[in-house]
Amino acid sequence: MGQTGKKSEKGAVCWRKRVKSEYMRLRQLKRFRRADEVKSMFNTNRQKIMERTEILNQEWKQRRIQPVHIMTTVSSLRGTRECFVTSDLDFPKQVIPLKTLTAVASMPIMYSWSPLQQNFMVEDETVLHNIPYMGDEVLDQDGTFIEELIKNYDGKVHGDRECGFINDEIFVELVNALAQYSDYEDDEDGEDNQDDERDDITKDQDDNMEEKETLPLRKFPSDKIFEAISSVFPDKGTSEELKEKYKELTEQQLPGALPPECTPNIDGSNAKSVQREQSLHSFHTLFCRRCFKYDCFLHPFHATPNTYKRKNNEAANDGKLCGPYCYQLLEGAREFAAALTAEIIKTPPKRPSGRRRGRLPNNSSRPSTPTVNVLEAKDTDSDREAGTETGGESNDKEEEEKKDETDSSSEANSRCQTPIKMKPNIEPPENVEWSGAEASLFRVLIGTYYDNFCAIARLISTKTCRQVYEFRVKESSIIAPVIAEDVDTPPRKKKRKHRLWAAHCRKIQLKKDGSSNHVYNYQPCDHPRQPCDSSCPCVIAQNFCEKFCQCSSDCQNRFPGCRCKAQCNTKQCPCYLAVRECDPDLCLTCGAADHWDSKNVSCKNCSIQRGSKKHLLLAPSDVAGWGIYIKDPVQKNEFISEYCGEIISQDEADRRGKVYDKYMCSFLFNLNNDFVVDATRKGNKIRFANHSLNPNCYAKVMMVNGDHRIGIFAKRAIQTGEELFFDYRYSQADALKYVGIEREMEIP
């Protein structure tokens, strides 16, 4: 046992040495390849320049040389001096005027920044990308600043530990290179011949490195390789994680391989029949249900499956026939569709004879599958025709009335019209084959349109409603039921007013509470079938439940909006009192949802979300650096602009702020207790507004559709051409340190 332990320990040490040596060799080989690529590109560009130069030389040889005008005197020119240019060759002396330029004031220093019109959330930078240059004076005054800055990033500096860098490409090459040892190594005497094998393997790899990299591996690499890599690079994960990563990377390199969790294009030739969740995976992952954008950069969190449920039917079946061969003419079709809808929306099916609630067929949780047979429908029709011939005049009239009703319903119901119009005497084909694209599209639509097979057939456009119905019956035991959210009954008007008043009093109480000054970021709560009590994230953060929360619409913690009929610019408005903008989905009487494309809106408490900013001008300031000026006059409390930038965490703001303090220039603005807006790298023009103890503007953090946003408003009436100032809320020492000049008092 002791010898076995020593042998395994010695083998692990040997594998670590192999990992280090192969890693250094691959890094050196990569540098050589990079140098060869740069050299090749340089030679190619050089050759192109030489060819172009030769063409220009040939053109110049064919042109006529124009004589140069030689000035004799410049004394008549004002503000110039006469200069002579002489040459040692036999060229005549030239007279050149020397013009004197007047002194021009230099422009203020401006660091590069990227303009944007809305906030942009970024991740924390855990690695210092570059050591900022502060000048020799700053380093002489504070020699430990750089050391403290590096400590804030846990000593991680980009490019400092180059030997510890490993990307996906080097990782795959390293595993492939180490796999060669397993092929040559023998379990019994492998340790005794390591040096000889190392020389042979290295020689073979140097000769045929490129060929071996392109060849597929015969067998999966040994676990010893991943254990050795994990021991050398512990921050890259465990051996099992590295093994899974290697499988994923090698599978992506195979020809025709698709990315993970990728479904083939539904319109392509390789379309597959997949379930609804797989077809909508990209939509659910990339779509933001708060700003209704794909790949949102403001809300990086992913929605939970509870947000995928629909609260109502997109197009309920109204019972009208779409044509002479509508699926509703089949026996048991209407009952099956009603039971299906009742199961999905959790409401019992309505019987045609009354309003009593009934159970699902067969007392089961899933709707019963009726016996669908086109031949039976055909026999039934023929029996009806035979009965009509012998039934007398009354039966003839009833048949004509049914026919007229069917024709009128098919003409009136244009929404459910089936795209394939069948002739009266042609039976629909049986055993129709469904392609993968059609089956996948059907499973997607069934979760939206439920029992409206006519609408589904119209969207598929290659199948009739009867074929869609028959396919749904066949898959009734395969498709998982789409459970919708419970249908909420709207409360009575008196209760609604009571909740509005209770919410209004609750907002006032929060304003009076000292702890309400701590504003936290809003995250939608998601606790299905649980009330918003003390365990609700919104209640804990002292935030109201918004329309994005998964709680019930009659939740006591929900903000109900306002019912104002004025401009919503006084504390009489609940939204204005709660420092919120009016929500167009909640505030329906103040005009927040009207005239969305127009600036003339009655509600004055929705300027940030509408982007109703003023025209700003950028110019040098008399106070410090650059300043921002207003082009048009602005009234008191009128919205000017939103302060936009990068949304960073408080920890990231502390790290960046230490650098900004040395530059004596900061664009950090506290958004809430969790995040800060930094307009240093990205922002809009309002970032150039300077600080003043007597400002003409003020900043206000408002809740806008679930997001905290910073609005800049006029503190008084501002005339055209005035520079904009607002209070940075510096301490007295910081104000003297960063802003040495205070603007003169202006009489409004």
Curated annotation (Swiss-Prot):
The keyword tRNA-binding does not apply. It is found in: Nucleus. It holds the Pfam family PRC2_HTH_1. Residues 505-607 form the CXC domain. One of its GO terms (biological process) is heterochromatin formation. InterPro entries: CXC_dom (IPR026489), EZH1/2-like (IPR045318), EZH1/2_MCSS (IPR048358), EZH1/EZH2 (IPR021654), EZH2_SET (IPR044439), PRC2_HTH_1 (IPR041343), Pre-SET_CXC (IPR041355), SANT/Myb (IPR001005). Residues 200-215, 376-387 have a biased composition (Basic and acidic residues). Belongs to the class V-like SAM-binding methyltransferase superfamily. Histone-lysine methyltransferase family. EZ subfamily. PROSITE patterns: CXC (PS51633), SET (PS50280). Polycomb group (PcG) protein. Catalytic subunit of the prc2/eed-ezh2 complex, which methylates 'Lys-9' and 'Lys-27' of histone H3, leading to transcriptional repression of the affected target gene. May regulate the circadian clock via histone methylation at the promoter of the circadian genes. Residues 183-199 have a biased composition (Acidic residues). The keyword Nucleus applies. This is Histone-lysine N-methyltransferase EZH2. Residues 183-215, 347-428 are annotated as: Disordered. Component of the prc2/eed-ezh2 complex. The lineage of its organism: Eukaryota, Metazoa, Chordata, Craniata, Vertebrata. It catalyses: L-lysyl(27)-[histone H3] + 3 S-adenosyl-L-methionine = N(6),N(6),N(6)-trimethyl-L-lysyl(27)-[histone H3] + 3 S-adenosyl-L-homocysteine + 3 H(+). Residues 614-729 form the SET domain. Residues 348-359 have a biased composition (Basic residues).
